Amino acid sequence: MAKFLLLLRSENTEKENRFYIQAIQRFGGEVVFISDTDSYDDVLHALDSVSGVLLPGGYNVGRLDYFLIDYVVSHQLKLLGICQGMQSMALWGSSHQLISIGNSSHHQEEGYVHSVILENSRLQDILGVHSFYVNSYHYQKVLDSYYFRVVGKSSDGVVEAIEDSNHSFQIGVQWHPERMLEY
């Protein structure tokens, strides 16, 4: 059974964290938890036992986000960034900042909101489609990504997916796939 490290953000509710936990377990994974208040030594110890990291959604780039991305990239672990986690991946190593979207079309509490169009990518290979509808909970966006390649955008040009083209699974998505399991 593969072990995946899940960063528990202190601003996330128990319900929000439960979605991530259930998704990992549903697909046969075991969850190793760290908190965004844990020491760097504790985080390094936890990273020794996992094959991948899930960077979840949240409201701000946390103090451990870039530390985890540094470790994952240098040790070639699997990485899935969701919502804020993807934004952290996109901003990693750059001086770029998050931009306010300015409308509510990307923040709806339920259902599928807009489509995402994928370029030639691993994510497209995994999903087996070029375009599909996603949920959307974000108020901010990134314009580009410094290290990871942009592979998906919404019809209005918002970056929705990024990946490391040189690694089999280092992917960030702006939507919440863990919540799509209930639709």
Placement of each model-derived feature along the sequence:
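N-terminal beta1-alpha1 cap of cysteine-dependent amidohydrolase-like domains
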Residues: 1-86, 90-92, 102-127, 131-133, ...
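A glycine-rich, often tryptophan-bearing local segment used as a flexible ligand/cofactor-contacting loop or short
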Residues: 94-98
